[in-house]
């Protein structure tokens, strides 16, 4: 459980985070979304006690991060890339962290295994790819078997296989009852794993909602269907609440139903489908609309003041 | 995993592990005996009685290689703290030990004890080796002579304190080149510049600058016009305490 109470962070004249309050609950994945530079990393740094808030405070598991006797057991964090010494091996990096808490050596081997780094464990981190560096950061986050996991842009630099691995990992961590808080600037990626969303723009809270509500309100969730028999399928799918548009011949955008219903309907009537894709791009669009508004709003305010 | 807590002993284990798992530590520490013994032997081999170096203290003469050691342990001190900022490792370190100060104290303790041990071993090796070449000269001396052991041990203690001072500077400056710049500028070059000034009070103060105090500490026979061994050691300790205290205050306040 993470709680932010009116967090505010100012660097000189620049206010990066303003009066931010939210709660992240255990047992689900919570996405922390915002465009680049919206204050996500600063917020995470304040939660972890790396930066002191100008006002407000954050707690993890009921108290300030630094007040926990075993911080790594309370929160495991993937920080921005390169939070390590490039001259040290992956194994020694993790061992040094483990030693601060008396975490057994066997656990170091376990997280190396879990992140697929066992073979690279004794290589110096200098030679690691971006993806391997991310995996090592995730290994460090899991080292203390933490109740809460905080990951800053975990899919950055990962190959498609790695992205898939992260999705599964996040869901399984949440299923174990842990609090999982994942920042990202990609709505479509986040919507695949998260159930809850906290969206910020320019350091302010824009939305604290579920993915389901966000999708419904955004009007996203259209399904793209490519079929040689479009007219028939349109007739079969027509129902109250279902809207179908066909901008190009043979390609339908269906709103108001899901891929499962469309697929079954087509199969039942022997209609060939070339493509059946839930349209995540419109979700991305809704997210961009939401955050762009906040940026424009802020810009207008500044203009009015000047 | 029920007994997980951060304790001072565990932080010590972690910092000890960190120091020995990067190559630069091994390289730097290996250079200390190599350069000191090498310089000592070269001096011993080329020394002539009654020459220009006759009035140089015997310990200072044989340990002339400590000029290199000053730089080496200084760099090592800066790397220990500022290196974590340059690489970004500091974020991991401070997430594991969010109370922060135990990390600073532990780093200082680990670096001081390792420096002291390596330098003392080097000195106890260098002096007798150089003396085998100086046996028939006016610089002949043995470990049992008055002040010799005190100067050899004092030199090691002084260099350990210099390393801690550098570590404090590294933590304050948070940049390896910046830290090395401040170290050489303020500690090595500044006293030489100040000495040129025609004021006695400045001369008195310069005596207690780290490098000057270290020179004084390395004398078997205290020379007039330099600090006494006790005062020199105290001065070096105060430099270390002052920089480390400033580093601690800022470490607690600043964002990582």
Range-by-range predicted roles:
Chain A
Residues 2-195, 199-201:
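ABC transporter nucleotide-binding domains
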Residues 66, 85, 103, 188, ...:
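Short alpha-helical
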Residues 101, 177, 218, 241, ...:
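Conserved NTP-handling cores and scaffolds of large molecular machines
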Residues 101-105, 163, 227, 255-257, ...:
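Short alpha-helix boundary/capping motifs
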Residues 110, 212-216, 300:
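Short, flexible cytosolic linker that couples an ABC transmembrane/permease module to its adjacent nucleotide-binding
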Residues 116, 241-245, 272-276:
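A short linear hydrophobic-aromatic micro-motif
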Residues 166-253, 257:
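ABC transporter nucleotide-binding domain
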Residues 255-306:
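C-terminal coupling/interaction segments
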